[in-house]
Amino acid sequence: PMHLDDLDAHVMVGYATTLGAKPYPFEYLDTTAGSGVYAWRMLKANVTVNNAESYSNACLAGLGIIQVPRVSAREQLLDGSFIEVLPALMARPMPISLLYPNRRHLPKRVQVFMDWLSELMQTYR
């Protein structure tokens, strides 16, 4: 697909968190008319999965298009297993949360890890 409307001729791999739920739609930043709001488009899905590994594997098997954060597909994009389509239609950024015990003095190694991860994720913004 080269344009948003081209997606209608393709199928996606559906992703749903629970059995029987509707799959998530394709999400993109709608810049038509300068709106700059996120919009959704439901694509036909022949298969729906409920975990990230199955989602990627279904795409690799040719069962449809998937929408994942670049960091999740980095290796497949680099080795050519995945081909990025419609890169201008970015989905909303996904937050990453780090949970740690509430302590007055945070261990240095925890702080170093948090700083490293934060810097690493800046690459994917």
Describe the residue ranges of each PLM region:
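A late-sequence structural motif
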Residues: V85-R125
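C-terminal regulatory
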Residues: P1-P93, T123-R125
